[in-house]
Regions:
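N-terminal carbohydrate-binding accessory modules
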Residues: 23-76, 106
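Aromatic-lined substrate-binding rim segments of carbohydrate-active enzymes
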Residues: 62-128, 200, 204
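Aromatic- and acidic-residue-enriched segments that line the glycan-binding/catalytic groove
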Residues: 91-97, 110, 121-146, 196-200, ...
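An active-site-proximal structural segment forming one wall of the substrate-binding cleft
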Residues: 100-117, 141-177
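Active-site neighborhood of glycoside hydrolase catalytic domains
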Residues: 153-227
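Catalytic-core region of carbohydrate-active enzymes that cleave or remodel glycosidic bonds
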Residues: 206, 237-335, 339, 350
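A cross-kingdom feature marking solvent-exposed beta-strand/loop segments within repeated
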Residues: 320-321, 340-343, 400, 409, ...
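Aromatic-lined ligand-binding clefts that engage carbohydrates, nucleic acids, or primary amines
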Residues: 420-434, 463, 530-553, 560-561, ...
């Protein structure tokens, strides 16, 4: 309110000066909250934003996606900063190439867009461990999202380092960043105001609180996740606008009217249905909120792809587990390949009607193409490509092995004996169990499986447990216990198995594998070739594979899993070259039937129009 009074006083002085014959002063530069809205350069301003994540879009396409978002009527882009991609190991930072967040923000500015930055450190985002680097979990005593000194010290180092990249891009320094979000939906997690105040102090030391700083929460969590001195905004999905804005207005009657996330779509999880939401309803609610004076950020305006190993997993109780797919299409207005879907024009029309600015023509779609893919040329058995092992009395987690993603093969000797029950307590998150390289069973955390019945053994045998990190949970208190691999006791009929060898398989450089022409069955790498005459966007159809990971040259395109609901991997033109392109697929249950083709559109399984409760 003090700011609003100052603005009114400034306007009155300007009017008085004009009446006296003097030239009115130029509007004060800057961006601020005034009452229930924003002012920019002294004039009322309505933020109309959309979320885009730089790490989910090939860098060559950043400007294209930003341009299409602006053409829809947006004036701002919102993005998270993803700690785990920028600090893969403690004190080792990467802001290059695909991870150059400052370049993405400058690209937004070049397209005439403002930016809202959400540094976290927790971001959720259906992203691995909610954006936290997994090495934080190596210390099992460290408590994420708390005032634990070990945690806050790591956060301080990260936020200060991030500030070196983005502080020059704040509006006050000539950049496009008009606002910064403190934490992320903290009210859905806890209500420790000391934690939020400490994080606010960290932001200030990093120079990230020099402009508008705000908190963002779901409607039922506003009181828990807000600070009295900061503006509070509300997050919700389509169909919930009237209820959510009423709760925000009741919580802060004279406060900022803004929707920090309007979920105009939803994400997919392995083994579940593909989500599609009602674009007509979303356009209707956009119109309602804009007419009511709300600033809005669409989540997502363009989802893109969670390339590589970086998908997260949903969990509400800590015992349920729902890993997210590689595709982050989100049924957004701009689809995974950057093409406007029907929602785009509907929402553009709603924005134009309220703002009075004519809608730009809907951009033409990019036509995807297909390319021939060879049969499997060569293969490499996992058993023949193991590194030197790490030895320990009991199994070590991925984090204790200093490994973030991929697989670990755990090996131990079994005594002779009859069949028994093998228990892998706290197995995270998918395992195949072998006795003398013969598959004895599969365990899937999604299904709550932790036991396998082993066969009888006439002599000493070798037990191998191949464990995949299928994505650490990114939501709920489960994040605090998301160590990956064999995280608890491993017993055979109640007796602890000891003296383990562990083979680290991060699979960050498949080019070093030893391929042969010999056929391969079981956990195998397969090599094929795609011949490209002229690079263009395409989709690799993975219905001829089972479960695993796929690389195009040096690019890790992501996971495939025959359970769906997504049966294609988006393959962007900038990552293709003319001529022969090498494809490597790791299939945990490979066999001679494995094959790949390309298609010109994504392939989804069963569709649902229902969004799960968040």
């Amino acid at each position: 309110m003090i700011l609003a009074k100052r603005l009114l006083s400034g306007a009155a002085l300007a009017m008085a000066a004009t009446a006296a014959g003097a030239q009115p002063a130029a509007p004060a530069p800057g961006f601020a909250v005034a009452g229930t809205g924003f002012v920019k350069d002294g004039e009322p301003y309505q933020v109309i934003s959309g979320e885009i994540h730089y790490v989910r879009i090939p860098r060559a396409y950043w400007r294209d996606r930003l341009r299409k978002a602006k053409a829809m009527g947006l004036n701002t882009i919102t993005t998270y900063a993803f700690w785990n991609v920028h600090e893969p190991r403690p004190g080792v930072y990467d802001f290059s190439g695909q991870n150059d967040i400052a370049a993405f923000i400058r690209d937004a500015q070049a397209e005439g867009l403002d930016v809202i930055l959400r540094p976290g450190p927790y971001v959720c985002a259906e992203w691995e461990l909610g954006g936290y680097p997994s090495w934080l979990l190596k210390d099992r005593k460290l408590v994420l999202r708390s005032t634990d000194p070990a945690y806050t010290a790591a956060v301080e180092r990260w936020i200060v380092r991030l500030g070196q990249e983005v502080k020059p891009l704040l509006l006050a320094n000539g950049g496009p960043i008009v606002a910064v979000q403190l934490e992320n939906e903290y009210g859905a997690f806890g209500d420790d105001k000391a934690y939020l105040r400490g994080l606010e102090a960290t932001y200030r030391r990093a120079g990230l609180a020099d402009g508008v700083l705000f908190t963002s929460n779901q409607a039922s969590d506003l009181a828990k996740g807000s600070l009295p001195q900061l503006p509070s905004v509300v997050n919700f999905g389509s169909g919930g606008a009237a209820n959510a804005v009423a709760k925000l207005e009741a919580y802060r009657p004279g406060g900022l009217r803004m929707v920090g996330e309007y979920w105009a779509g939803w994400f997919d999880k392995w083994g579940e249905d593909h989500h599609e939401t009602d674009g007509h309803k979303e356009a209707e609610e956009m119109r309602f909120m804009l007419q009511r004076g709300y600033s809005i950020s669409l989540y997502m305006v363009h989802g893109g792809t969670t390339f590589g190993w970086m998908n997260g997993a949903d969990s509400h109780t800590g015992t349920d587990y729902h890993p997210d797919t590689t595709s982050y299409d989100y049924d957004a207005q701009i689809d995974e390949a950057g093409n406007p879907r029907y929602k785009y024009a509907l929402i553009a029309k709603a924005i134009a009607e309220v703002t009075g600015k004519p809608a730009a023509p809907t951009p033409a779609p990019t036509v995807a193409v297909t390319f021939p893919v060879s049969p499997i040329r060569r293969s490499a058995s996992l058993w023949d490509n193991l590194p030197d092992p790490v030895r320990a009395r009991l199994p070590l987690t991925f984090e204790e092995l200093d490994q973030n993603y991929g697989y670990v093969l755990y090996r131990v000797a079994l005594p002779a004996g009859g069949g028994g029950t093998l228990t892998l307590k706290g197995m995270h998150s998918y395992a195949q169990v072998y006795v003398d390289r013969k598959l004895a069973g599969t365990l899937d955390r999604r299904l709550g499986q932790e036991t396998v019945t082993l066969p009888a053994r006439a002599g000493v045998a070798t037990l191998d447990v191949l464990v995949e990190n299928t994505g650490r949970v990114n939501y709920s208190h489960a994040i605090r216990t998301e160590q990956t691999g064999l995280t608890g006791a491993v017993t055979l009929d109640g007796k602890t198995l000891e003296d383990w060898r562990m083979y680290r398989l991060p699979m960050d450089d498949p080019s070093s594998l030893r391929f042969t022409a010999a056929p391969c069955v079981g956990p195998c790498f397969y090599e094929a070739e795609m011949t490209v005459d002229q690079p263009g966007d395409t989709y690799l159809d993975v219905r001829g594979l089972h479960k695993g990971q796929l690389w195009l040259g040096s690019h890790n395109l992501g996971r495939f899993w025959s359970i769906g609901p997504v049966h294609t991997l988006y393959t962007p033109a900038p990552w293709l070259q003319r001529g022969v392109n090498r494809i490597i697929a790791f299939d945990v249950t490979g066999d001679p039937s494995d094959r790949l083709t390309t298609v010109d559109a994504p392939v989804f399984g069963k569709v649902t129009t229902t969004r799960e409760a968040q």
